[in-house]
UniProtKB/Swiss-Prot annotation:
GO biological process assignments: ATP synthesis coupled electron transport; electron transport coupled proton transport
EC number assigned by the record: 7.1.1.-
One Gene Ontology molecular-function label: ubiquinone binding
Catalytic activity: a quinone + NADH + 5 H(+)(in) = a quinol + NAD(+) + 4 H(+)(out)
Name of this chain's protein: NADH-quinone oxidoreductase subunit M
Organism, as annotated: Rickettsia bellii (strain RML369-C)
Keyword Hydrolase: no
Length: 494
């Protein structure tokens, strides 16, 4: 294997591009500097995506430990190191981040009308910070990346969002920042006792903390990740953020940022505090079941397409948390698969809604109807994405939900049957959405002038559609990669 600092390259390439844009292109007096910025952003995202493909190709799925490990001293006095690596749990999140960022940047070139340079800079920053969070093996560095992601997303919602964008951006920031404060206090306490931030081994020490200490730390860390995922009752920021965010912002929010919550449970909470995790697991499971049913019922009542998809995200992430806290191989594997699948499906749905919004400038369901007669390609894409969201066998959405339910069935049969109701409710509201938007007669005269997808829209949506089908038909291509890492986590701590 070629010895390259490939993870550092993947993390810092977008940051270097941002510096180049700000220091050189911004100061240039040439009239084409906006086009120059676009070229740099696209090139950066392409190269970052290529580097993640290289990691995927070279990754050894038979090795459950961290690979491509890099360790550089940063602040010796407190043991702070830039310590990064990739295992089966993190590898697909890194790939998903670079893939969705590339799609968003390409799409933004045609849809963003103001401050395009700043917009692209925010997306490159988010790409760098997300990859940093998914690859960090140092707890404090993970926290720093986890926290700083707030800034570019806050700006994206607040500057390029809808009419109530400031309210949504502030609500998003305050919710997430509130949870992060408790997370930071927990990190400080842990370091004061064991003088280490190394995620690869500090669980061996924190596991020996008195149970009451573990319980307090558990709730403090749990809240931070429960807000991010989000779980009820910490969910109210998400619908507002999705409705007000621009299309690409919703793609990154649903496709990547929500996954940081589930990833945090697996990477931080469970390994650091396994005893407390087992004690409180039943509460998380029932909270997840409530979230699945509640969010599904609320989604049924929505009149805004993006808000309906936002509540469906809460439902889907509920399956993630019941899978994780089942502490079973099938449950945790299902949770990981569900996170990857949801990242693809929800991104696809938000892009589809974005194409409709670009034409009619409204997300209100009642304003549509009969769109399929004018946009058959979009209607086909929408159908596949909708069926994936419902969890139809043959799509990626089925595998994650099935494995998560299989995992929880081994723990609590009643919770399994109640959680399965979410699948039925999901089918009802998603089929209702498709029927009201795509089928029937055209009632809005503006729809008569609709033209089908442009090339750049097909380029953005088609790869996601192919992945929904491919992962649904070939789930082993994903499951085999993270199986040993999941098994290693469960055997080591549970």
């Amino acid at each position: 294997m070629l010895e390259l600092p490939i993870i550092s390259i993947t993390i810092f390439l977008p940051l270097i591009s941002v510096l180049y844009i700000l220091l050189f292109i911004s100061q240039s007096k040439k009239p084409d500097k906006q086009i120059h910025t676009m070229y740099v952003a696209v090139l950066s995202s392409v190269l970052t995506f290529i580097s993640t493909i290289y990691i995927l190709i070279e990754f050894d799925s038979s090795n459950p430990t961290y690979q491509f490990v890099e360790r550089y001293s940063w602040l010796d006095k407190i043991g702070l190191e830039f310590h990064v690596g990739i295992d089966g749990i993190s590898i697909f999140f890194v790939s998903l981040t670079s893939f969705l960022t590339l799609i968003c940047i390409i799409g933004s070139l045609f849809t963003v009308k103001k401050y395009i340079k700043e917009y692209l800079v925010c997306f490159l920053l988010m790409e760098s910070f997300c990859i940093g969070a998914f690859t960090s093996i140092n707890l404090l560095v993970f926290y720093l990346f986890f926290e700083v992601i707030l800034v570019p997303m806050y700006i994206i919602i607040g500057v390029w969002g809808g009419e109530n964008r400031i309210y949504a951006a502030v609500k998003f920031f305050l919710y997430t920042f509130f949870g992060s404060v408790f997370f930071l206090l927990s990190i400080i306490y842990i370091y004061s006792k064991i003088h280490s931030f190394d995620l690869s081994n500090i669980g061996e020490f924190t596991n020996n903390f008195p149970l009451h200490v573990q319980q307090i730390l558990w709730w403090a860390i749990f809240i931070a990740f429960a807000i991010k995922i989000p779980m009820i009752p910490f969910h109210t920021w998400l619908p507002d953020a999705h409705v007000q965010a621009p299309t690409s912002g919703s793609v990154i929010l649903a496709g990547i940022l929500l996954k940081l919550g589930g990833y945090g449970f697996l990477r931080v909470l469970l390994p650091l505090l396994p005893n407390a995790s087992q004690e409180f697991a039943i509460y998380v499971i029932w909270l997840s079941v409530i979230a699945i049913i509640y969010a599904s019922l609320v989604a049924l009542a929505q009149k805004d397409m993006k808000k309906m998809i936002a509540y469906s995200s809460i439902t889907h992430m509920g399956y993630v948390t019941i899978g994780i806290f089942s502490f079973t191989d099938s449950g945790v594997s299902g949770a990981l698969f569900q996170m990857l699948s949801h990242g693809i499906i929800s991104s696809c749905l938000f892009l589809i809604v974005g194409t409709l919004y670009e034409r009619l400038h409204t997300k209100e369901i009642a304003k549509y109807g009969g769109v399929a007669s004018k946009m058959p390609v979009l209607a086909t894409f929408f159908m596949i994405a909708m069926l994936g969201s419902v969890g139809l066998p043959g799509t990626s959405g089925f595998i994650g939900e099935f494995l998560s339910l299989l995992g929880i069935y081994k723990v609590n049969v009643i919770a399994t049957f109640l959680a399965a109701l979410g699948i039925i409710l999901g089918a009802i509201y998603m089929l209702k959405l498709y029927k009201e938007v795509m089928l029937g007669e055209i009632t809005n005269k503006e729809i008569i002038n609709f033209r089908d997808l442009y090339i750049y829209e097909i380029i953005s949506i088609a790869p996601l559609i192919l992945l929904i089908i491919y992962f649904g038909l070939m789930p082993s291509s994903i499951l085999n990669v993270f199986h040993l890492s999941v098994e290693n986590l469960l055997v080591k701590f549970f």
